[in-house]
UniProtKB/Swiss-Prot annotation:
Record note on quaternary structure: Component of the mitochondrial large ribosomal subunit. Mature mitochondrial ribosomes consist of a small (37S) and a large (54S) subunit. The 37S subunit contains at least 33 different proteins and 1 molecule of RNA (15S). The 54S subunit contains at least 45 different proteins and 1 molecule of RNA (21S).
Entry similarity comment: Belongs to the universal ribosomal protein uL29 family.
Residue stretch of the organelle transit peptide: 1-38
Origin organism lineage: Eukaryota, Fungi, Dikarya, Ascomycota, Pezizomycotina
MF terms (GO), sorted A to Z: structural constituent of ribosome
Keyword Ribosomal protein tagged: yes
Alphabetically ordered keywords of this record: Mitochondrion, Ribonucleoprotein, Ribosomal protein, Transit peptide
One Pfam assignment: MRP-L47
GO CC aspect terms: mitochondrial large ribosomal subunit
Stated name of the protein: Large ribosomal subunit protein uL29m
A Gene Ontology biological process term: mitochondrial translation
Length: 302
C-alpha cells in the first residue's frame, strides 16, 4: 500500500491542473503536467503554447490607452472677438482710428465726372439709352458696288468700321429694349430695317475687295512671266531691257516745210496769208457784189 508521502506529489499536480487560471499566474509560465513532461519539449513548441495561451486568456483590448484628441494647436479656442488680449503691450497709440465716411453719391454718376467726348458714347444714338423708332428709321440707302469701286483703300477701311459700329449700336438698342421690358406689337422693325441696310453696304465692300484681289492676282501672274520684272525681293523690281530697235528712215521721204499755210486756190479768191500792196490788186479778182457786176475802183482826183 502506497504511503501518503508518495501520493502527495501526484495530488498536488492534479490540484494544480484543476485550479482556475488567473490573469496573474496564467501569463507567467505555461502549465506543466505529466503529459507535457512525457513529450519532448522544444523552445519553439513552448513559445507557441505561450502565445496561444495569451490570446485565449487575455480579455483586454490590444491597445487599451487613451485616444489622443488634440491637434497640438496652442491657439485652439482663442477667439478674435472674445479674447483676453495680447500678452504684452505693443507700440500702438491709444487714439481712435478714423472711421470712413459714407458718401451719399456712391454708385451714382455725376455730370462733372462724365467725359462728354468719351469713346463709349459712340455706341449710343445721341447719348440716349433707348432710341425712338423715328430715330432708328432716319437713315439713307446702302452703298452700291459701282460707287465703292472708285473709293481708296482708306475710305473702304473707314466705311467698314463705321458699319461695324452701327451694327453694335443696333444690337445695343435691341438688347436694352429687352432688358427694360418695352413691349410693342413689333418694336424691332425699324432696327432690323436699319441693320439690313448696313449689311448690304458691307456686302458691297466685300464685293469690291474681291474684285481688287482678282485683279491683283492676274497682274502678279503677268509680272511673273515678264523678264523685266523681278519679284524675288532682291534687287530692283523693274529692269528695262537694253536692246532698242533702230528706226528705218529709208521709207520716209523728206518734204520741204512750208513757211506758211496755204489753202486750195479757187476762182476769184486770193491765197490766204499772202500780203500785197493796194496798187497791185487786180480789180477783177475782187468778189462781185450782190448785183453780179464787178466792183471797179472809183476815179481818183488829180
Amino acid at each position: 500500500m502506497a504511503s501518503s508521502g508518495a501520493a502527495r506529489p501526484a495530488a498536488s499536480r492534479v490540484l494544480q491542473r484543476c485550479q482556475p487560471f488567473s490573469s496573474s499566474t496564467s501569463c507567467a509560465a505555461p502549465v506543466t503536467t505529466w503529459r507535457t513532461l512525457a513529450r519532448p519539449s522544444t523552445a519553439a513548441a513552448t513559445a507557441q503554447a505561450t502565445t496561444q495561451q495569451l490570446r485565449l486568456l487575455s480579455i483586454s483590448m490590444p491597445l487599451q490607452k487613451r485616444r489622443t484628441t488634440r491637434d497640438n494647436n496652442r491657439l485652439r479656442g482663442q477667439s478674435t472677438i472674445h479674447r483676453s488680449g495680447i500678452r504684452r503691450p505693443l507700440s500702438v497709440s491709444e487714439e481712435d482710428i478714423p472711421q470712413p465716411v459714407q458718401d451719399e453719391g456712391v454708385g451714382k454718376m455725376r455730370e462733372e465726372d462724365t467725359d462728354p467726348d468719351h469713346g463709349l458714347w459712340g455706341f449710343f444714338y445721341d447719348k440716349q439709352l433707348v432710341p425712338t423708332p423715328k430715330q432708328l428709321s432716319a437713315h439713307g440707302r446702302s452703298w452700291t458696288v459701282q460707287e465703292l469701286r472708285g473709293k481708296s483703300w482708306e475710305d473702304l477701311h473707314a466705311l467698314w468700321w463705321m458699319c461695324c459700329r452701327e451694327r453694335n449700336r443696333i444690337a445695343t438698342a435691341i438688347r436694352t429694349r429687352q432688358f427694360i421690358g418695352i413691349k410693342k406689337d413689333n418694336p424691332f422693325d425699324e432696327a432690323e430695317a436699319r441693320g439690313r441696310t448696313v449689311n448690304k453696304t458691307m456686302q458691297a465692300i466685300k464685293h469690291v475687295l474681291t474684285e481688287r484681289f482678282y485683279a491683283w492676282e492676274d497682274a502678279r501672274k503677268l509680272a511673273m512671266e515678264d523678264p523685266e520684272i523681278n519679284l524675288s525681293g532682291k534687287g530692283p523690281i523693274y529692269t528695262p531691257s537694253l536692246h532698242f530697235e533702230s528706226a528705218d528712215t529709208s521709207s520716209y521721204i523728206e518734204e520741204p516745210v512750208a513757211d506758211h499755210l496755204e489753202t486750195p486756190e479757187t476762182s476769184g479768191q486770193e491765197k490766204v496769208g499772202e500780203l500785197s500792196p493796194a496798187g497791185a490788186v487786180d480789180p477783177s479778182t475782187i468778189l462781185a457784189s450782190k448785183t453780179g457786176k464787178p466792183v471797179t475802183d472809183a476815179p481818183r482826183s488829180s
